[in-house]
Amino acid sequence: MACEVKHCGEIRDFKKVQEYFGLGHDDNWLNAINHAISPTGELIAMAQGEKLAFLSTCWSSHGNGNTYVLGWCGELEDPNQIVTSLTCLPMTQNKSTDGAIEWTCVAVGLCSGMVTFYTDSGVKLFSQCCQEDPVIGVKLQSAPRHSEADSLLYIIYPRCLCFIQGQDILPTLNNCRHNVQRGALERSSYPTADVVPFQKYKFKQEREAVINDAAISTTQRPPTYDYIVQQTIGLGYFAKVHATPPRSSQVLAAGAEPYLGFFQAEEGYKTMSLGEVAKDVIGIAYKNLLGGIFRRAPEPLPSPEESPLPVPTKEAPMRIRCRLYDGKRDGLTLSVAPGGRLAVVTDNLDRVMLVDTHQAIILRVWKGYRDAQCAFVPVKEKSVRGIKTHKRKALFLVIYAPRMGCLDIWALQNGPKVAAFNVSKSGQLMYNNHSPLGSGGSSGSGNSSSQSRKSLAINHCLFLDPSDGSLKEIHIPFHYALSETSSQTSRDIHMLRRLRNQLRTINHGQAKDEALQEIGELASELQTLEVRQQCLEMLLKSKKLQPQVFQSIINAFIKKPLSESTGSEEFVNQIENYKRLTDLYLALSQANQREDNEPPVEYLELSDADLVTINKLVLLLDDGTEKDKPAATREVSFKLQAEHKTEEFVDYLSIFNIDSPDGISLLPEKSDKFGAVSIDLFSQFFAQGLCFGQFKQWINQACLPSRDLLKLIIWFWLEKPFKYNNCDEVVEDMSRIAAMVQTICDLAGEHIHDYAYNAISPWWQEVRELLLESKQFSGLLVAIVCKTVATNLWRNRKEGSCDESSQNEDDERWERISHDEAQWGLLTGKLEDVAVLGAILSKPLICRDPVGPEMSYEPPDCSLKSIVSSGKGIVTELTAKWLISAQLHPSKVLEISPPENELDDESKVKIKDEPTKESVDEDAESEEDLEMAKEVYAASKEAHEPILERLALLRAHFPFSLESGVLLSLMSWQYMVQWSKQLSSLDHLKAALLCLNQFRTPDWALKHGICCMLWNATLKFPLQAAAKLIQKVGRLPVDKMCQQDLEMSAGKVPEFLELSLEFLQHFTASMEHDKRELHFEQSLSEGALPLQFLALQQHHAMPQLLRLQTELCSVLHFVSFFQLRIPKPLTTLFDSMSNKALLADINKELPYVLPAPDLVLQQQRTEFLCRLVTATMDLIREDLEQLYILDHVFYMGKICALADSWEVDKLPILRRQVVELYAFGYDAEAQVLLQDISDDEELGRLLLEIAGRRLNLYAQSSQSTFLKIASVGHQLLAYLDNLKEPMTENNIQIAATKPDEIDVAALDRLLSHAYKYLCRRESKQLPIIGQMYNAVRILQN
């Protein structure tokens, strides 16, 4: 243990404070400011000029040190004031028994003599001026612990000191803070004193004396003898000496002329002599007599109500004890040690002087410390663990020389320099010598409460390092205060240093045996218990401790024990236990080949079912990487063990309880290290052969309980890598483990069978509980081994019992299995299921035809305990995540043959129609043949997809949890949840819809429930945001708005709305469903409710609300896809009640009835749909005389579906479609649609207009053509001229732009269709169509 400068705090806002003071370019800026830190470390105060900054602690996850942030910064109320000193005063409550700090007060001294008190949050509480001189310092003199004295707050001025009792200032500050917290504006409700009572003591200054610093060394009553000597020296022969010395405070002042002064500030009233008393009595009588003669009454005493506020008493001069003069020397700073016995003074001549304050003498002088900063560090002796010793105390002096950048530590009073550190040259050494205000004697409530408080940790000395913005503490071990020549501890410390250096160089050039011998000799030279304990702790903390080194040191301690008077019984027990552990470790790790007389390990006899299970695990976990290296890697791994026994050995020692004298036991809280330790401990033993004779001997010598040894063996198997090529290798290793378990049971003796007949064995029950938490696949193999060993032991004991002869054959026939064996059977069954589950899910696979987005996958924790206790839906959830990571198409999740609960009606009808003459057995056989045929066909069809093979294996173990409907529910949920985290990734939404599309009809109840949950959890709010955005803009928003509100680009919004519409269609289709019941495996216990159960618990969606959401989604999709501009589409196409219903929960019934749409709303909807029909024309494209019209037909189907939902007349929609097709020149497609429209005069008028526009365009081809058309009649010519006028909204624009594009024959057919619709009624346009028909005939001829 050496001196250290440890990091204990971090100041995050260090640069911010530096910039706040305007000193950002000054490296030594800390010298230009005033600073103080709370002795309990919760606050740092800094000030410069009129600026203040308070840094408070905050919680940080990095390390255990304090983290300081800027809590408050501000300026003084008076900008003309300048801060000259700072002090932090932690405050405690009188009623607090633990001494906890409630808040921190900051006392700020100003150049005007004012002292202002602030809270730690920067709120001004109270201010008082005791002397109109600059304040040199504000300090607190704490009372000794468990004393009746009171703390003393004193203010240092250039000519005087002002004392304020702690019991006077404490309630004032608490009262002011209470007023601030309550927000009280009237002081009458919370009375406080305007002036806190204080006592002023004046320095007797002669010549041109200067006071730079002062401090109180003690406030205790001086001893009688010292008091008599002081009075005699001070007053001479006629000195008056009292029987009880008055209480006085000794004040030390550093400055110039004198360099150092010792003063006495006497407290209380001075005792008067008999003559002074007689003089005062005569004066009072004379005054009263004259008052009676002149009819003047004596002055009444002031009443308590009229008495003024307390005022300071008359200043009293301090009595000079002695002074040290030095004309060239000026004292700069003064620091008093804890206890007040010593003080240190720095001066302008680069000297540091140690002063004895009681004797008033200079004890020691250090030279060469320019601008030094000093601090005292008290250190207590630490007691050895488990040994009660008297704690001694030592005092060290820390001197910081900023010019040299060094930090020196000196032992007091006459000790040497014990350490020196290089630190920053711009730092500050911060020293505190006071306790919190309110603790100790300042509580004012008696000594009983103060004695019950716990002592707070005081940071006496801290170093503020601006280079890295950190706060550092100086750690000094106690033994540095001991004498180097006479102390046995110091000698042992020196030997410990040599031992540590020897340990560092053990592997560098020196022979190992010689090094171990020298280390043992050095360890045996340690003669003190404390240093031996330190040596042991040093070894256990080392990460590179070698077993042979540790054994050598332990043997040295045992061979040369300490004297019995030192009370080292517990330490001796620890050493002996460590020796047993080390010997066992070396014996097992250095095991040689098995002896010749050792019987070979018998192969374990396993049942066929166990062999099938083992072979299944080997095939599942075989990845093909180890086939080329059958056994070489396993042997090499064991040979390398001898070179890597450093950290493993330390962990091995740490998992045992070595404090008990009876033996060694495992520590349950270190169970996380059992696996690694057991691998390191037993690997060599298993690799070199099992020598059980020596093994029993080693265990008996180590005094290790058999129960703990069995735990380590099981952990060894569980942590061992599962790398086998075939089943024979597994059985071989299982046989070794079985032999080891059998040996441990032999060591345990009859303790194993200490339980009632046919009850559960406590010995094996602990093993089963350990296997429940196993996360590896080897847990099943260990369970099989232990079950076999336990069964053999039980049967051997049963055969050897004398009661067996009395049992008859019937009893033997029925009583074949015990209760304990039944428990093993249940455990192995569960472990088999979980092992298969873990083996499959631990290896993520990608299917041959991946579908859907990639999702990250982490192999789950598949221990039996986690699977059984995580609820009934855990298997479904884990398998769904595995299937999603495999990117398997959801259609392949469906079972080859539906489960019993999913038989459809057709299969039931077929079963009923079968002949009833066949027996039940024949029916069962035919069904089994049919299923086998289906499986063979499916297997050939899927071309041996590995994922489907593993899924089928999982379904054999978990048939209910892995039904297709349940899996699809979880997969769709996982996809949608992932999409909700990143809305722009629409691939996840598509994958979820693909899962919803694969639900079978019997699973529609699950589908409807999961749709309800997905709507409320993921889709509802993005869809509402899109509706709100389109309602605001009236069209598809720009990309920036979509990114801000929808977290996706504008180009993805139409696709998102289309997918949402598809989801709502799935939602609507699943409304009609049958009842669905869920089944779970019995091994899964109750826990968190599974998702499929929550889905079935959902209320059905309301059809009206679902229809409204579908209509809204359709409108939003049309507006965004066709980029229409519709102002306020939600209020235009939906009434107010419908808009309100769109915000309601989809599975809660509305409290009102939605009204039927009025004529205006229906007209607006019709116009919107007609605009959509016009927009769909852009989807028709023509390429190489081939027309692509499927997209147009697809969206026309959607438009008609929306019209049906709105109950809008579809005739205007079909009319618009026909007209638009004719306008774009698609006459053949339009002619097909005319068959659906029987009687519509408006359609005839529009067709006539299209024909007129075509004729107008054709007339532009030549002059003769125009003359032919004009020769028909003036009425046609006038009609054609009207069509040439500017276009309006009601007019129709044709797509043709050139006369060559007009087909006269098609125009003839168009006129015939127009005439068919106009001739049914006497229309005014019949003459026009007749003349136009004649004109077309002329053009044709």
From Swiss-Prot:
Subcellular location(s) of the protein: Cytoplasm; Autolysosome membrane; Cytoplasmic vesicle, Autophagosome membrane; Presynaptic cell membrane
Record-linked Pfam families: RAB3GAP2_C (PF14656), RAB3GAP2_N (PF14655)
Topology within the bilayer: Peripheral membrane protein
Keyword annotations of the record: Cell membrane, Cell projection, Cytoplasm, Cytoplasmic vesicle, GTPase activation, Lysosome, Membrane, Phosphoprotein, Synapse
Region of interest: Disordered: 432-452, 896-928
Sites of Phosphoserine modification: 801
An example Gene Ontology CC term for this record: synaptic vesicle
GO terms for biological process, alphabetical: establishment of protein localization to endoplasmic reticulum membrane; macroautophagy; neurotransmitter secretion; positive regulation of GTPase activity; regulation of GTPase activity; regulation of neurotransmitter secretion; regulation of synaptic activity; synaptic signaling
Function text: Regulatory subunit of the Rab3 GTPase-activating (Rab3GAP) complex composed of Rab3-GAP and Rab3GAP1, which has both GTPase-activating protein (GAP) activity towards Rab3, and guanine nucleotide exchange factor (GEF) activity towards Rab18. As part of the Rab3GAP complex, required for the rapid induction and sustained expression of synaptic homeostasis at the neuromuscular junction (NMJ). Also participates in the regulation of autophagy in tissues such as larval fat cells and adult muscles.
Family, as annotated: Belongs to the Rab3-GAP regulatory subunit family.
Name listed for the protein in its UniProt record: Rab3 GTPase-activating protein non-catalytic subunit
Organism: Drosophila melanogaster
